[in-house]
Structure formats: C-alpha cells, structure tokens
Design a protein with these regions (language model features):
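Structural preference for solvent-exposed beta-strand-turn elements
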Residues: 1-365
C-alpha cells in the first residue's frame, strides 16, 4: 500500500476517528486506526465495539491496500509534522511515514483482525441542520449524570414528533429540555444516546450542512459530510420527566439574561460550588434580591430589576446549577417560574428559543 495525503487533511481525519478507539481494551487491534487506500482516497475506521467511526478523505493512491496503525502514536506524529504532503508505504508488518526530512517506521497490526464496520439497517431517520443540532446538545449535555450505576441518566433522550426534534437530559437534581421545529417529519422515534458521544458528535467541524440521525434496533447512526458515526443505544426506560414539570406557577419573573448571570456569578464568589443561592422575588418592588453566604467566608447580595407576575416568593437553588442553566440561554430575556419554596424552579428561554431548565430547590434553615 502506498499513498500521499495533505498533512492538514490527515490530521483532521485522525482527530475525528480518534474518538472511536479503545484506549484500555485487551484487544490490541482496537487501539489502532484501520486505513484502506482505494480509488481516489482513504477510508479510515476506528471502533471500541460500542461505537464505530468511519471517515473518507481524498488522497493520491499509488498502490491500494489496507493496514492498521496504532492511532495515538500516529496522531502524535502527524501533529508534529511540517505542513507538507505525507507519504505512507507499507512493507510486511511495518509502515513508513515520510514528510519533508522526517521519516518514521512503525509496527502495524493485522488488518484482518480489525472488526468489520457495522452493516446498519436504519429503520427511521431525520435530517437536522448541524448548527441547531450542536446548539441543542450544548444546552442539555451539561445536565447528563456521571453516575454509571444509572445508565439511562448518563444519556440524552432524543425523540421526534410532528412538531420537530426534542432532547432531554436529567441527573435527578435538574432537567433540561430543548426543542427545535422541523418540517416534514415522516416518522416518530425515541432513543437514549450516550451524552459523551453526543458531545463528541457536536464537536465535529461546523459546516452549514445537515446531519442525519438514524436508528436501528440497538444503535444510533449519525451521518455528516463524509463521515459515519455509530453508537450503541442505552437500554432502559428514561424517567417520566413530563410529570415533574409543574403545569402552573404562583410567580413568573422576567429577567434580563445577562444581568441575572452576572449577579449570580458575583454573589457566588463567596459560596462553594454546591452552596445554594437564594432568590428573593419582591412582586411589589419589581426586583429580586440574589444572595449567598458561606460560613467562615462571608455573604453577598445583589438587587436585580425584573418584571413579576404573581406573588412574592423566596427560593434557594444550587448556585452552580443555576449558572449552568442560565449560560445555556441565548435569548436576551429569561423567565423564571415557581410555585413554592419547596417546588422546582423553572427557567425558560425568551422568544425564539424553546428551552426549559428545571432545578430542584435546596432546603435552607
């Protein structure tokens, strides 16, 4: 096998497929990147048996063939090569990588041992503008649980309806729901997908193109540009999140988003990350007092102007959770709804963005 490829295109391809390698597997070939040189380019594949990634990239192929090269070592080498053409040439169980005045001879792995790329039979699919997909993932992913003992909470519930696409995540202390409207949705589907994997997909190079989301019996398939990313769906039943979203409120407050963010950040300087921030809403005065305190450190408070519908109320919420939710809102205004100090508080984005963020209250003395 022999081919030449532009260094920047090679680096981009390796960076993408590196997300699919198994770094701690007892199967050596899973730590490598499978490369097939054919026709006008290369097919690169990686897998850890849970996820699989395929990427096609143009190259000048002089001799077709296949090989598997240790991915981490190859990526480190390519990162440090000059901006020039990179030549690969295999010989028995080695590959020589040459660029400019540099040359590396590496041991390869047997391509025959590399698992075949999944032959997926997609039962239903939907196309979504990639920029909107990434925006949804960014809003909900930070709520995904890191507790592996409850697998469904480490995932994001993706569902479609006649109205469009929805993503939902919860760690049982908070809940994030993001919606976008789509036209022409032919089939409705629902799947729980790894939150980590979704963030990796959303981290791909941004282009003004659509990403296709497809489902098989036990996998989710993302097709974007010249790449295919497959991951096993998380099995289990996602919590019935709809039943914990209050249908009514006693107080609804409209804040300027950035003003509320900066106020919470400032009072949070005297509190630990898990400490509560108190929001004291005064309906008559048309403001909210944001305050926080930590024993042996001190206290802080800030008055924020707002529009209040309903009654005055005070509620305490986890400081970091509040910031996470507010930082996910991109509209100029944000609405806050609650019905009592011991009921959830709900942040909703303003006009033009369909995003809900629910936080469970903190009991304070």
């Amino acid at each position: 096998m022999r081919f030449n490829i532009n260094k920047s295109e090679l680096l981009n391809a390796l960076t993408i497929v590196s997300k699919g390698t198994a770094s701690r597997s007892t199967i050596p070939v899973l730590s490598g990147v499978y490369i097939k040189a054919e026709g006008m380019g290369l097919v690169m594949e990686t897998t850890d048996l849970e996820r699989s990634i395929r990427y096609r990239v143009p190259a000048l192929v002089e001799e077709e063939g296949t090989t598997v090269i240790p991915e981490k070592l190859l990526l480190d080498i390519v990162k440090n090569l000059p901006e020039a053409a990179v030549e690969f040439q295999t010989n028995d169980s080695t590959v020589t990588v040459s660029c400019g005045k540099s040359s590396f001879t590496l041991k390869t792995l047997d391509a025959a041992d590399f698992p075949p790329f999944p032959n997926v039979d997609v039962s239903s699919s939907i196309e979504v503008p990639f920029a909107e997909f990434c925006s949804m993932v960014k809003r909900v992913a930070k709520v995904v649980s890191k507790d592996q003992s409850r697998a469904v909470l480490t995932g994001v519930l993706i569902s479609t309806s006649d109205e469009g696409l929805r993503m939902v995540a919860t760690d049982s202390y908070r809940l994030a729901v993001a919606d976008i409207a789509l036209e022409g949705v032919q089939e409705n589907f629902e799947a729980i997908v790894s939150g980590v994997f979704l963030q990796e997909v959303a981290g791909l190079p941004k282009m003004e193109e659509n990403i296709t989301i497809g489902l098989t019996a036990n996998q989710i398939v993302f097709t974007y540009q010249n790449m295919v990313l497959i991951n096993r769906r998380i099995e289990g039943n996602f919590p019935n999140y709809r039943q914990i979203i209050p249908r009514s409120w006693a107080t609804k407050t409209c804040f300027t988003t950035q003003e509320l963010i900066t106020a919470v950040k400032r009072v949070g300087l005297v509190s630990a990350l898990s400490s509560p921030v108190k929001i004291d809403i005064n309906a008559e005065a048309g403001n909210a007092i944001i305050n926080a305190a930590t024993q042996d450190v001190g206290s802080a408070e800030e008055v924020v102007g707002c529009e209040v519908a309903g009654e005055s109320i005070q509620i305490a919420l986890n400081h970091q959770y509040v910031l996470d939710g507010l930082m996910s809102v991109s509209t100029d205004q944000v609405f806050f709804e609650t019905s009592s100090p011991m009921k959830p508080g709900i942040f909703r984005a303003g006009a033009g963005e369909n995003f809900l963020y629910l936080v469970m209250p903190v009991r304070v003395s």
